[in-house]
Swiss-Prot record:
The protein, known as: UPF0145 protein Ping_0381
Family the UniProt entry places it in: Belongs to the UPF0145 family.
Pfam family, one: YbjQ_1
Species of the source: Psychromonas ingrahamii (strain DSM 17664 / CCUG 51855 / 37)
Lineage: Bacteria, Pseudomonadati, Pseudomonadota, Gammaproteobacteria, Alteromonadales
Annotated InterPro entries: UPF0145_dom_sf (IPR035439), UPF0145_YbjQ-like (IPR002765)
UniProt superkingdom: Bacteria
């Protein structure tokens, strides 16, 4: 499965738009990460625990987006974008969305 943030895929011709596909993950904070985040907010610097958590969540959202495209019989997903939103105190949602398409064989 080809997936891209661009609207086209170089060297490939889109023959059909299958539809919008999404993949999302709701991730909750871990108390241990919160303690480290509190310390980092005082002294500054990257909060690696959160960076790793969000990277894992983004990767899982992409996997779910690709699975959705496969279920619809798509060859690729173009125009992928990401959104992040707070769901409740201590958790957030990462959503990946794009357009599933069929390519000329």
């Amino acid at each position: 499965m080809i997936y891209s943030t661009t609207e086209t895929i170089p060297g490939k011709e889109i023959t059909e738009i299958v539809g919008v596909v999404t993949g999302n993950v709701v991730q909750a904070k871990h108390i241990g990460r919160d303690i480290m985040a509190g310390l980092k907010s005082i002294v500054g610097g990257e909060i690696r625990g959160y960076t790793e958590m969000l990277t894992e969540a983004r990767d899982l959202a992409i996997q779910r987006l690709v699975a959705s495209a496969n279920e619809k019989g798509a060859d690729a997903v173009v125009g992928i974008r990401f959104t992040t939103s707070a769901i409740m105190d201590g958790s957030s949602e990462i959503m990946a969305f794009g357009t599933a398409v069929k390519l000329k064989k």
